[in-house]
Amino acid sequence: MALTQYPWLEEAAARLDAMRERLPNAILIHGMPGVGTFELARWFAERLLCESPKADGSPCGKCPGCRMMHANGHPDCRIVVSEFLANALDLPYTPPETSSSSKKLSREIRIHQFRALTDFLTMAPSRGGRRCVLVYPADMVLSLIHI
């Protein structure tokens, strides 16, 4: 995934890329809706999980890691979004065990999604590199805090 559609994100992408060797435990990427924050986060996750980055450090788009990211199936990346966004963006979504198929798609990130991350975060990376968890939009997590 290239950020060529979002030239205004080049500076933010460069700052993220400069941190890739000494990453903190979490990075909060924020911006107005529609400016490409999700795309920037996906690009950076792909950059971290790329097995053959280009000379400029950008993801190659061709290695197994990049292909798995494009197919939304990289074993070392989890994308946590609402059921509504998962449907709109064609992302994987696992409904809670008590879910009924006739209900309206949830626009909130649900607690069962974070509980499902426990096993993922305690295991070693499958491909030997890093693991990434993208939570989008992060402000949807606040509704969990008030439960």
Could you say what each language-model-derived stretch is?
Residues 145-147:
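Conserved small/polar residues in nucleotide/adenosyl-binding loops
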